[in-house]
Amino acid sequence: MHTKTIVELAQGFKDKDFSCVELTQYYLNRIDQSDLNAFITVTDELALAQAQVADDKIASGNANILTGIPYAHKDIFCTKGVKTSAGSRMLDTFVSPYDATVSQKLNQVNLVMLGKTNMDEFAMGSSNENSFYGAVKNPWNYLKIPGGSSGGSAASVAGGLSCFATGTDTGGSIRQPASLCGITGIKPTYGRISRYGMIAYASSLDQAGPMTKTAQDAAIVLNVMAGFDEKDSTSVEQKVPDYTTHLNDSIKGLIIGLPKEFFSSGLDDEVANNIMAAVKEFEAMGAIVKEVSLPNLAYAIPVYYIVAPCECSSNLSRLDGVRYGYRAKNVKNLEDLYLRSRSEGFGEEVKRRIMIGAYALSAGYYDAYYLKAQKVRHLISDDFKKVFEQIDVIMGPVSPTTAFDLGSVKDPVSMYLADIYTLSANLAGLPGMSIPAGFAQNLPVGLQLIGNFWSESRLLNIAHQFQLQTDWHLKTPQEC
């Protein structure tokens, strides 16, 4: 049952093959037996109670396609009455008094929350090794990383521990783990999904999205997650289309742009071969391929690692050991309380980024670093605008390599370089997606799709058409 999609499980409920309670218990048993370390908190009692409500809804004829579907929620979304840690010691004891808007929306359609997934601390990381709760393992090979920061979410879907999961993407944190774990993940246009109650890392870059088995499932979940929210000042008041409507549209005549900068040195040969094979599949469906250029792509990493740390140093200043969160014991005075609570509560990578951000925002350096980074960010955005005048969608790799060994990358800069292909979509606020497109070294490879603003329907249509022609998304890890 753990390989079934949302559509297949909903049909199973309809045909009375199993009840919501039975399905939920099945998933809870799988989580209990798993050693992927994908979950921080398992909400078994809550899940079974929600499943019973869902069964009642189905029996009364008031169900929707998502009623009773078990999912995993990234532990960055506030959940009323349930621990919300963001993968940090700082929030290890924090129980949210309210629901994030995303949590609220998912509750309204009677989904079943199995638990909160493991993640890089405060979403800062590309390997899910930066969690206070330990590293997450890749279901395809337990010695490999699952990607980050939504590694627990990706591992839970790929490992058959949930039907789908929520994720967040600040610089690739949905797309990269989706790619490395062989699942489907979409980061919509900035402002499409409310950030209210989603613990902030970098406010101008953060965006939530679904992580699923298929593009069709992603469309179904995005229908619920998307929408304007007056509680979020960055939320855009734009009507949400039904993302399932155009899934079956023909993609004949689609113009695909391949940025030459995506295929330069540093890209693994086997990964490149898989990407080009996927592009040929689209050509066989009638798509047209053009080479394009994003000349400022090389600056995406330095720009991101100025802008994001600056925003995080401001956002995380609220965690001081006074109002909530970790508080150091036996402190001498208020200054000692701040100093020790933050130094003991935050992990190494979070402290590194706070320090970088505080330095870049300090007097005398603001113009040289932060202001300059924002100017180059606009240049990167302009590159995309010019490219989308000629094409419909950008395609390329998500990550330069497949999943690397746990503990093998010690140098932070080497870790940052792995984000080269994903960061630019966040800097420009564009929608991006990863879909399974093959294997290299027996590990999944994801194809990245980047669209123009508000083109989620088109991306999902393109992805769905690819999945009708290929079976990469149907592959499951032997360990699971």
Swiss-Prot record:
GO terms for cellular component: glutamyl-tRNA(Gln) amidotransferase complex. Its EC number is 6.3.5.7. One of its GO terms (biological process) is translation. It holds the Pfam family Amidase. The keyword ATP-binding applies. Coiled coil: none annotated. HAMAP family: GatA (MF_00120). Heterotrimer of A, B and C subunits. This is Glutamyl-tRNA(Gln) amidotransferase subunit A. It comes from Ruthia magnifica subsp. Calyptogena magnifica. The lineage of its organism: Bacteria, Pseudomonadati, Pseudomonadota, Gammaproteobacteria, Candidatus Pseudothioglobaceae. The gene is gatA.
